[in-house]
A protein has these predicted regions:
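Soluble catalytic domains of enzymes that build or remodel membrane lipids, polysaccharides, and related
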Residues: 1-150
């Protein structure tokens, strides 16, 4: 199953660039790294580039922010020089008892975690997966203020 062509058309018309294992240098100040979605092997994103490969060659003096659907590969991102990983995916378990068991599946299931020099932020998001309901979790939009040092 590939991405919905209507989505592709919308993204193109809106001039949105999807970063599928791609890097953008923003204003020569910091990097945005978009990862392919590991959960969607049928949409053409099965073969993801490993963190050490996608981050190699980047100027590590500049902040590196990784955008990822799932909070995966924290250790690999940290050892490869990423400064921050921003994720969704977990919905913080969405419904009881998932909100209790999700913490067994992910090192950072929801919230903030510092792993070495990597700052990982995972939101429960505003959407749902499967049934359109939440029990025992909250929807959230997480405002983040980043101050670059150095």
């Amino acid at each position: 199953e590939m991405r919905d062509p209507r989505f592709e058309e919308f993204v193109k018309k809106a001039k949105i660039r999807i970063l599928d294992d791609e890097v953008m240098l923003i204003d020569d100040a910091f990097y945005l790294v978009g990862r392919k979605d590991a959960q969607k092997p049928g949409d053409g994103t099965k073969n993801r580039i490993e963190p050490e490969v996608i981050l190699s060659g980047l100027d590590k003096a500049k902040p590196i922010i990784v955008l990822e659907h799932q909070p995966k590969q924290l250790k690999e991102l940290e050892t490869s020089g990423a400064d921050m990983q921003l994720c969704g995916h977990t919905h913080d378990g969405q419904m009881f008892p998932g909100n209790l068991t999700v913490k067994l599946m992910w090192e950072n299931a929801c919230g903030y975690l510092k792993k070495g020099n990597l700052h990982s932020i995972v939101t429960s998001g505003v959407g749902v997966w499967g049934p359109a309901m939440r029990v025992g979790t909250d929807c959230e939009i997480c405002p983040i203020t980043i101050h670059f040092q150095g």
